[in-house]
């Protein structure tokens, strides 16, 4: 354990009236902390056939981690808001498979190496305290919660959701906007269901070309970029419903403040300040073309027929965490490399045993992803806030030249 978690220490503050001032933490330290413990078992086998032209490597593992050091809430009467203590039992189990083959190998120097790998991991929070009183521990909270909850996968995403009826239809309120749940629910987990990759290397005499494709399937990500982008209307996918050209419905607001959909595009005029007017019931009335009709049902179960402005709709889903949680699956062309091994006659003149030049490129192409506008590998931190993205920069492609020499 960190030695600063074993005893209360004081922090120097700005002097008061020339007198030294120190403050103590609101976190109660614990001199009885124990080291975290991890026990694991692993079993596997390797097999090779046809002079190593085909090989298989399989591994199964099970890992139990206990005595995690957590900051748990405590009564304020103790003088602290939380206390450091040992708690938690997390179990991980999974398997990894690697399959390799040399499908083609000729006497003229051509060779094709193929490698496949696949891995799946399942995590479960077995318990958080010995007494069984704590059922959930918050790892992160801002717009959405990342939790360790007993009986669930480590790192579940927990937040507000759409209200739905028994048939799964979104329920709208009296104004035609999606209703927000009054209680939070599990919206996913940040760990993938499985990961895998395929690597190919084609070599012919002194030339070699290789490429790597990897994939991650399953898992969820909460995107603050998409959340805020919808609210402010700066994303291309929020053009939907903004005007008639992008599917917006024409409507006007009656004397009672209700939006009334127009059956068709009206014959309108545009005022000097850019507002639209049309004849409605024999009167010149301001009309709008940014109407959206949410696909859903009313609280009574009838089909929704209320029109809302695109602005109000996108502002509403800003507050619904479920609307901003996406599938984090992806398939990427991770790396391509072209290598040339210099002729031995050249290397001998340079007093070298071997030399090669390699051109490389990384993160060249995202073949598939589900989440828009961001890289699904983006993360707020590498710690407990995995599964949360916040205004991340685009992933960069990189290119390089490597010179390898052997004396």
Regions found by a protein language model. Name each.
Residues 18-26, 64-87, 115, 122-190, ...:
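Surface-exposed, extracytoplasmic segments of Gram-negative outer-membrane nutrient-acquisition systems
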Residues 196:
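Extra-cytoplasmic beta-strand recognition segments
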């Amino acid at each position: 354990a960190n030695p600063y978690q074993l005893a209360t220490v004081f922090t120097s503050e700005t002097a008061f009236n020339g007198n030294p001032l120190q403050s103590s933490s609101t976190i109660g330290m614990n001199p009885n902390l124990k080291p975290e413990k991890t026990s694991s078992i692993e079993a596997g086998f390797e097999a090779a056939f046809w002079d190593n032209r085909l090989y298989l490597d399989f591994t199964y593992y099970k890992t139990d981690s206990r005595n995690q050091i957590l900051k748990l809430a405590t009564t304020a009467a103790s003088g602290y808001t939380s206390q450091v203590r040992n708690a938690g039992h997390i179990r991980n189990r999974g398997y990894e498979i690697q399959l390799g083959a040399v499908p083609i190998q000729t006497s003229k120097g051509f060779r094709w190496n193929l490698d496949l790998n696949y891995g799946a991991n399942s995590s479960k929070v077995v318990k958080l305290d010995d007494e069984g009183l704590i059922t959930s521990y918050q790892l992160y909270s801002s717009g959405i919660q990342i939790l360790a909850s007993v009986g669930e996968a480590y790192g579940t995403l927990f937040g507000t959701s759409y209200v739905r009826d028994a048939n799964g239809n979104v329920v709208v309120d009296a104004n035609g906007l999606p209703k927000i749940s009054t209680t939070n629910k599990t919206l996913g987990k940040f760990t993938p269901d499985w990961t895998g990759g395929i690597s190919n290397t084609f070599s012919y005499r002194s030339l070699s070309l290789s490429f790597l494709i990897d994939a991650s399937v399953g898992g969820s990500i909460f995107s603050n970029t998409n959340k805020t982008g919808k609210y402010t209307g700066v994303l291309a996918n929020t053009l939907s419903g903004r005007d008639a050209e992008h599917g917006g419905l024409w409507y006007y607001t009656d004397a009672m403040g209700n939006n009334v959909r127009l059956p068709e595009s009206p014959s309108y005029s545009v005022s000097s300040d850019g507002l639209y007017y049309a004849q409605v019931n024999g009167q010149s009335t301001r009309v709008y073309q940014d109407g959206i009709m949410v696909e859903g049902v009313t609280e009574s179960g009838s089909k929704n027929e209320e029109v809302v402005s695109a602005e109000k709709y996108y502002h509403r889903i800003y507050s619904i965490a479920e609307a901003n949680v996406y599938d984090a699956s992806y398939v990427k062309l991770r790396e391509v490399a072209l290598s040339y091994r210099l002729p031995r006659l050249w290397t001998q003149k340079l007093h070298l045993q071997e030399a090669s030049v390699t051109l490389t490129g990384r993160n060249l192409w995202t073949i598939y992803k589900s989440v828009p506008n961001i890289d699904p590998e983006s993360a707020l931190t590498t710690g407990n806030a995995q599964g949360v993205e916040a205004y991340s920069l685009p992933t960069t492609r990189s290119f390089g030249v490597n010179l390898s020499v052997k004396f």
